[in-house]
Amino acid sequence: MLWQCWLQQAQRMRMMMKALLRFRATRLDSEMMGGWRRGAQRLAAGVVEGQRTLPQEGAAAGPRNLKEMPGPSTFRNLLEFFWRDGFSRIHEIQQNHIREYGRIFKSHFGPQFVVSIADRDMVAQILRAERDAPQRANMESWQEYRDLRGRSTGLISAEGKKWLAMRSVLRQKILRPRDVFIYAGGVNEVVSDLIKRIKTLRSREDDGETVTNVNDLYFKYSMEAVATILYECRLGCLQNEVPKQTLEYIEALELMFSMFKTTMYAGAIPKWLRPFIPKPWEEFCRSWDGLFRFSQIHVDGRLREIQACLDRGEEVKGGLLTSILISKELTLEELYANMTEMLLAGVDTTSFTLSWATYLLAKNPQAQQMVYDQIVQNLGKDTVPTAEDVPKLPLIRAVLKETLRLFPVLPGNGRVTQDDLVLGGYLIPKGTQLALCHYSTSYDQEYFTAAEDFQPGRWLRHGHLDRVENFGSIPFGYGIRSCIGKRVAELEIHLALIQLLQNFEIRTSPKTQTVLPKTHGLLCPAGAINVRFVNRE
């Protein structure tokens, strides 16, 4: 009887959602048409102040309106995402829509209207034309939580002048390559613990070589490594007995990612329906509470240590957190928010990328051998690498770039137009949400020959002036709103890959065949990646 009751409620919900979405879609079409007419009138009059017009080769003589733009219907999106588990196949749906509608198309998703772009040159034009503070796509639920709890926004959730002010503080400390070099020693200590952990885990297997589900291992490595930089402390993630406080944070982090799908459902449900469907929002808030609590404990702990040093008349030494606390360039609430959001952004993104890189190297032994040979030739088998050593190993950097091309952590990125925009022959009004389809451009044969293949060599420079730049694959974004943690992530992955290859030959395991990606907020492995770490002779 319970399942029958649930089914009846679900059917009623579906009917309500359909009616709601149909109403909202109609209203949005009307609003977008109104915006187009106003924009067209301003264009005709030649008085569009500050507009960035991006003509597309081969476009029609005059801009077309958004009603003429192709795209899936609201009902089709509803069916695809809510009935066919489309949230786990966003990357596939992206490609299907491009094949059907072309490289620019529109979509209605609940109350949101989105124009999707899957053209490398259009993406480049959009990003190069951005102002000083580009606006990302709607993150209303994040803002609502912060308003509810009296929390500040951080770099991921903030917009406008506040975002720009925080960005200017943090970019001076972690965005330039030379700024992150000082963290290499701490990261190498974590890599050493990672190697020890691999040896422990494989010793428990019958063959003495296999590590099952390497992403679980890399998750702990990533969390430990980024915490040494953000919090200036060790968390014990790679110990046999993980501390309780760290386990509680891991639980909150896993809850945040495990409920991605329900959060997406909640985003399409109006606030007035929350009393009837409270669980998604309650769990969303609970996970954020845990993440903020963890950051606050570590920030406050470091603040007490600094004060104790000052009370003793001692010189205060430290890294990123210490520098910000002493300079007071951010308020304490802003610091809590940024540490929380940067840790959230820096764990799964790094662990998934390391998992895919390990998988690709195991599946491509010839490419792996070339990388290893370059390491031995330029560094040796036993030398612990520094950040300064990485430029000597262009293949290591190319492996990371090629891994992120094949498996971009974010299959798409969002922007909101800050001016009326002519793109692909269409007039897109100010305030329109854009989805930049990075997964699809990464696999476009026009931009990458043999796009399905793992070919790190495509990223190598053939001369000192030959810069390999391709907007078909920009996993860290571009311009002022590019990933603030790019250099930190690269450092963690480069140093880990170098030392993994110095110690082990990475081979496929009979337990793992082909692993496909799925979308779970981020692009992640749909199944466990099991590999063999064989000792180097």
Curated annotation (Swiss-Prot):
Biological process (GO), any one: cellular response to peptide hormone stimulus
Family annotation (CDD domains): CYP27C1 (cd20647)
Keyword entries, A-Z: Heme, Iron, Lipid metabolism, Membrane, Metal-binding, Monooxygenase, Oxidoreductase
UniProt cross-references to InterPro entries, sorted A to Z: CYP11_CYP27_families, Cyt_P450, Cyt_P450_CS, Cyt_P450_E_grp-I, Cyt_P450_sf
UniProt keyword Plastid, yes or no: no
Superkingdom of this protein's organism: Eukaryota
Catalysed reaction, written as an equation: all-trans-retinol + 2 reduced [adrenodoxin] + O2 + 2 H(+) = all-trans-3,4-didehydroretinol + 2 oxidized [adrenodoxin] + 2 H2O
GO cellular component, one term: mitochondrial inner membrane
Tissue: Expressed in the dorsal third of retinal pigment epithelium, but not in the ventral counterpart (at protein level).
Pfam families linked: p450
Known role: Efficiently catalyzes the conversion of all-trans retinol (also called vitamin A1, the precursor of 11-cis retinal) to 3,4-didehydroretinol (also called vitamin A2, the precursor of 11-cis 3,4-didehydroretinal), also acts on all-trans retinal and all-trans retinoic acid. The replacement of 11-cis retinal chromophore in photopigments with 11-cis 3,4-didehydroretinal enhances sensitivity to long-wavelength light. This may improve vision in fresh water which is often turbid.
PROSITE patterns the record matches: CYTOCHROME_P450 (PS00086)
UniProt protein name: Cytochrome P450 27C1
Subcellular location: Membrane
Gene name in the database record: cyp27c1
Record-listed heme binding positions: 483
Organism classification: Eukaryota, Metazoa, Chordata, Craniata, Vertebrata
Cofactor(s) the record lists: heme
EC code: 1.14.19.53
Alphabetized GO MF terms: all-trans retinol 3,4-desaturase activity; heme binding; iron ion binding; monooxygenase activity
Family: Belongs to the cytochrome P450 family.
tRNA-binding is among the record's keywords: no
